[in-house]
């Protein structure tokens, strides 16, 4: 879906302990908005933070009093190597950056992120810590619009050249972020098509599998694009 993000920033970061709350006041245009605190967990072992939300002094929907924001993780170094020559997955640690995690239905029944409805004007959103403390710096609102048809989007590609260079391969086992600690890189040497591959040793060469099967689990990769064009 196309999007328009709006960050409502605090004058200074605030640490919310359990039961503490902070209120954001802002002007906004009419529409539906996905929302997320911009946060950092205080505990280095936290895998999520729990909070509730109120809009204009009211609970906006069932479940708004029990929301979860997922913590983002990065690899802490490169894969290790045993004395046998087999590789082990790198350990993970929390990202050093402020985190965003749009509110969602933990049951997975609702396939979209939760949304708040605002009319044009001034509104308030109150976020309350429900468990372990976290630092909050802003409220992120992302306006959701109707998704464009690909045929309409493609019309804007007229005259744009297709990329005809060497294939760009992004290895699955090397993401820059994931929002679930269980999404670790793994080894599978049963298929020679998987890269890298070693017939004698176990090497880290993929990510996901059975661990990547829950709604809203996310993995982010990064790659260098050599030139403008269609890929």
Positions of PLM-derived features:
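Extracytoplasmic
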Residues: 1-231
